A protein has these predicted regions:
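Flexible "cap/lid" loop of the alpha/beta hydrolase fold
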Residues: 125-130, 136-168
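Active-site loop/oxyanion-hole signature of alpha/beta-hydrolase fold enzymes
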Residues: 36-40, 62-69, 75-115, 119, ...
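Active-site glycine-rich loops that stabilize anionic/oxyanionic intermediates
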Residues: 53-56, 118
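Alpha/beta-hydrolase fold catalytic core
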Residues: 2-49, 69-72, 109-111, 250-254, ...
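Conserved alpha/beta-hydrolase catalytic His-Asp/Glu region
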Residues: 151, 166-220
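The conserved beta1-alpha1 loop
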Residues: 51-53, 231
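Conserved serine/cysteine hydrolase catalytic core
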Residues: 198-249, 257
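Catalytic active-site module of serine/aspartate enzymes centered on a nucleophile-bearing elbow/loop
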Residues: 253-284
Length: 284
């Protein structure tokens, strides 16, 4: 199995950027979170902030949290319009980053290690522009700091909407209907984790209305600190053609690929992902 860690090599690190620092806004929301104290005694390690992706919640990175919690305090968070966090018509990465910064402030966390998957990875990268000195190290799982040209979730939106329109209340009924729209059983079961008493625990209309912003991206200023990009070998979200964009914004980036995995690489091969994270956190 091909699982390796490598430096991202770039031909030219001279570039111009039109990006500007994100401005601190006043639309921050108080996010729902869970704080897990480090299991090890007398540890002086930095806390880790875990950020889920689109349609997810704070439990989605639980397999990572349980391992990392042995040596680190871990904060699991529901992003706005997800889980038990507040709802809003605003769903920009600037807003998500401000929410995360407010959470760090409320918890009196001066610096943290930030790990985000998919949309959560983009929110984490946006946080580097808003509060560059508050992040010690950054891990981005299967997403790149680019605007994606294609819509990848229209079938998912159709399935979710069909369940809502049908007024279903049981997960088994919802799963049966969703199979008319989706072929991947793993995706269906992932989505159903957010289905409770006939309601989706994410703001489906707002996510649909803001989907262009979610797959879009405004480049952030170069963040010259250790960054790890983990990609699934079968995923199309982090392509070699994105290396220049990564280099401009994260000049200390390293790459780690886990063969035989798709977009949910951390769920498919969690031990490989954890090995990469531990190795990265142990590097100078």
């Amino acid at each position: 199995m091909r699982q390796h860690c490598q430096s991202i090599t770039f031909a030219d690190n001279e570039y111009d950027t039109l990006s500007e620092p994100l401005k601190i806004m006043n639309f921050a929301m108080k996010l729902h979170y869970q704080l897990l104290a480090a299991q090890a005694e007398n540890t002086d390690t930095l806390p880790i902030l875990l950020i889920h992706g689109l349609f997810g919640n704070l439990d989605n990175l639980g397999v990572l949290a349980r391992d990392l919690n042995q040596q680190h305090s871990v904060i699991k968070v529901d992003l706005r319009n997800h889980g038990l966090s507040p709802r809003s018509d605003e769903m920009s990465y600037a807003a998500m980053a401000q929410d995360l910064l407010t959470l760090l402030d409320d918890l009196q966390i001066a610096r943290a290690i930030v790990i985000g998957h998919s949309m959560g990875g983009k929110a984490a990268m946006a946080l580097t522009a808003l509060a560059p000195d508050r992040i010690a190290r950054l891990v981005v799982i299967d997403i790149a700091p680019v605007a994606y040209p294609s819509r990848h979730h229209d079938d998912i939106f159709a399935a979710l909407t069909a369940v809502s329109d049908a007024g279903l209340t049981q997960r088994q009924q919802a799963a049966q209907l969703m199979r008319d729209y989706l072929d991947e059983e793993g995706v269906i079961q992932f989505l159903l984790k957010s289905f409770h008493q006939g309601e989706w625990r994410f703001n489906l209309p707002v996510l649909f209305a803001n989907y262009a912003a979610i797959i879009g991206w405004r480049e952030v200023p170069a963040w010259p600190h250790p960054t790890l990009f983990i990609r699934g070998g079968l995923s199309e979200y982090v392509q070699n053609s994105y290396r220049d964009a990564i280099a401009r914004q994260f000049p200390q980036a390293r790459a780690y690929e886990v063969a035989g995995t798709g977009h949910w690489v951390h769920a498919e091969k969690p031990q490989a992902v954890l090995r990469a994270i531990h190795r990265f956190l142990g590097q100078p």
